[in-house]
Amino acid sequence: RRHTRSFHVTGVQTCALPISLGVKPRDAERSKNFFALGLVSWLYSRPIEGTVQWIESRFKDLVRESNLAAFRAGFHFGETTELFEWPFQVRPAQLPAGEYTNITGNTALAWGLVAAGQLSRLPVFLGSYPITPASDILHELSKHKHFGVRTVQAEDEIAAAGMALGAAFSGHLAVTTTSGPGVALKSETMSLAVSLELPLLLVDIQRGGPSTGLPTKTEAADLNIAMFGRHGEAPLPIVAAYSPSHCFTAAIEAARIALKYRTPVILLSDGYLANGSEPWRLPDVSTLPDISVPFATEKNHVNDDGTEEFWPYQRDPETLARPWAIPG
């Protein structure tokens, strides 16, 4: 109660008011969300022309007319009632000059993975099992086969992680996507990736929990399982995105760390970032980092007797990463 004293609660009859303006009761119940949208549009001083055009193009006949009536009723209710002292002003964002597009977090993350594949000169492999709110990454990546992206929809979370780990072993930029409960199911594979020292990205689009939780609600509460949710001593890096557009940069950074240090990496996003959108300035490709790493193709150790052999865990003195040798 103490925290709500600064709030003013105003009740609005979202069905009764449209009915008083001639909307049929059944249509008013269906259109009450548009009444609320009209009221919010007035409260935040937003122009309504674009919304009106969208309603006219999206709906037909009586549904269109009832939605338009409810939307306008909500807007004019806010304009004429004395329940609200003042509207809010949403000022245009101050953005640097450049070419922009509107992008969601999941789309930005998928594009970041495609970019990471190009920057590393590796084919991208995604092993995924559909789960809200991470499924859009699978949908988006499946559109980019012309960039060497391979996507597999597995039968379950464990199989998806296992496929991705196998792809990492064979020289791919390997990714598996999931949300909260899927992180638990993939934990054994992630432990194996730590032991094998293979670059594997686990993308966790967090949702409300625990357990199956609330798939359509957002929550950023998986840091604990990301840090400690593996058996034995199996530490790994964690990268977290902070905005929808930052998901692009975060994906490239997670891939860079995984490849350079030969380690699995967990990339954290959440439902709010995944489905939220914002203006994104298209990057200058020439400014993106080169994250390519060489495969081991030659023997790397000389024995006391002068013979040479390959040591799979010979350490790089700078990164302490082992050589990445692929089969064949």
Tell where the protein language model's regions lie, with residue ranges.
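Generic beta-sheet signal
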Residues: 1, 16, 177, 203-205, ...
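Single conserved hydrophobic/aromatic residue that forms the stacking wall/gate
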Residues: 2-15
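Short alpha-helices
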Residues: 16-54
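Short alpha-helical basic/polar micro-motif
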Residues: 32-33, 162, 245, 252
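Glycine-rich phosphate/pyrophosphate-binding loops
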Residues: 47-51, 173, 178, 262-273
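Thiamine diphosphate
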Residues: 53-228, 234-236, 241
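Flexible, low-complexity linker and terminal segments
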Residues: 95, 103-112, 120, 250, ...
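Active-site/ligand-binding-proximal alpha/beta "capping" segment
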Residues: 233-256
